[in-house]
Amino acid sequence: MGFLKILRKQRAREREMRILILGLDNAGKTTLMKKFLDEPTDTIEPTLGFDIKTVHFKDFQLNLWDVGGQKSLRSYWKNYFESTDALIWVVDSSDRERLLQCSEELKKLLGEERLAGASLLVLANKSDLPGAIDVNSIAQVLDLHSIKSHHWKIFSCCALSGDRLVQAMTWLCDDVGSRLFILD
């Protein structure tokens, strides 16, 4: 039995996923994570460094790594790539001025070898705000349709209400689960 097959069998038993949550500062990463965990969202501070939370969802154990998005912290993102099964890229859909910067940062991430094959969930957050950019336009600016190295999907959502968050996480778990936990 090959080493990879042994690792897959071990992970299949554990049904554990490592999910990295990234995006520019003020995109709503921490609020989304807290809402998903059913934690209070009334006092959110910018994440300086990272925060790890574990939750059971859809028969999986999800290890959620929420990493700060400030410009000064982005060079440290690479320290969190190892063993990542999925990347959640959070976009502030109301911030037109930084959408191009958001696209550039995502392209850098997708070129990282240690993220190769990781499922990509793009959450267009703050979709409830006036003037928010629709998901098709965001997908176009992020050039998502050209991505061949990762399974991906984009959802509009609202971190404060939790709108479409469960649906998005269900897609992510189904996608990662179909890659990692099917044994031959």
Curated annotation (Swiss-Prot):
Keyword S-adenosyl-L-methionine attributed: no
Summary of the knockout phenotype: Worms exhibit abnormal vulva, gonad and male tail development and disruption in embryonic proliferation. Subcellular defects include a lack of microtubule cytoskeleton and excessive chromosomes in oocyte nuclei. Many embryos show a lethal phenotype arrested at the bean stage just prior to the beginning of morphogenesis.
Pfam families for this protein: Arf
MF annotations from Gene Ontology: GTP binding; GTPase activity
Entry GO CC: aster; centrosome; cytoplasm; microtubule cytoskeleton; plasma membrane
Gene symbol of the encoding locus: evl-20
Alphabetically ordered keywords of this record: Cell cycle, Cell division, Cell membrane, Cytoplasm, Cytoskeleton, Developmental protein, GTP-binding, Lipoprotein, Membrane, Myristate, Nucleotide-binding
Family: Belongs to the small GTPase superfamily. Arf family.
Lipidation (N-myristoyl glycine): 2
Subcellular location: Cytoplasm; Cell membrane; Cytoplasm, Cytoskeleton, Microtubule organizing center, Centrosome
Tissue expression profile of the protein: In the embryo, strongly expressed in migrating hypodermal cells. Shortly before the beginning of elongation, expressed in many developing neurons where it persists throughout adulthood. In the larva, highly expressed in migrating hypodermal cells and the uterus. Also expressed in vulva, spermatheca, sheath cells, distal tips cells and proctoderm of the male tail.
Family matches, as PANTHER family: ADP-RIBOSYLATION FACTOR-LIKE PROTEIN 2-RELATED (PTHR45697)
Protein name: ADP-ribosylation factor-like protein 2
InterPro entries in alphabetical order: Arl2, ARL2/3, P-loop_NTPase, Small_GTP-bd, Small_GTPase_ARF/SAR
Function: GTP-binding protein that functions in embryogenesis, cytokinesis, germline development and microtubulule cytoskeleton dynamics.
Binding site for GTP: 23-30, 66-70, 125-128
GO BP, one annotated term: embryo development ending in birth or egg hatching
Main location: cytoplasm
